[in-house]
Amino acid sequence: MESPKPIRRTPPKNLGLLELIRAKREWDWKPSVAELKKSFRGWHQRGYLPHFDAPGVTQFVTFQLHDSFPVTRRAEFEAILKEPDDSVKRRKLEAWLDRGHGECWLLHPDMAEIMEKILLEADGHDYRMQAWVIMPNHVHLVVDVWDVPLVKLINSWKGKSSQLANALLHRNGKFWQEDYYDTVIRDEAHLKRAIRYTEQNPVKACLAKAAREWPWSSARHRDEYERLPWQRRE
């Protein structure tokens, strides 16, 4: 009898992705020595996904719970992650997450409240939140990256929330998927689309009739001019 194949703990090397990253590094922004010391890496990859990390950019970010991609359906979501067209990959990923796979721990009001507080506690100091939504098994953000690398921000948000979540839910183990998905906002029109997508996600997923009805979203904080509190102070 053949011995079972070991479970892969890290994604296999994606030569196409590595080549893409190398090409982007040739012509796109390169971090200075000072920025490298702060851990800004420019274009890089972690497993299946390309990432861009630089100061002074706005990013549309998605990260999801550990069980939102069940092991029993690994072939399906690995096929999504290997999709060569980035926009197609993003649409398929969002559709998968909106189906609500896994335990959906963020549907617990106490857990969603904890997550929102963590996201906003350094807003205006280390970064600026343009939009956010906490869905049952994932989080969307539109965030201005200032002087702290995006990967450090995400690791901080995940680390704090996973400790509190595991205590609240009386569980152990991983709470978040290790990686995340980021897209650099190109211009004002792209920013508006990303904000609208983020805040309309509960409506699209049939969890609310209107964006403002979802309690864990930036939409409910906007005034009649669509401004968030920090925008009203400027």
Segments (PLM) and residue ranges:
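Short catalytic/metal-binding and nucleic-acid-binding patches
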Residues: M1-E234
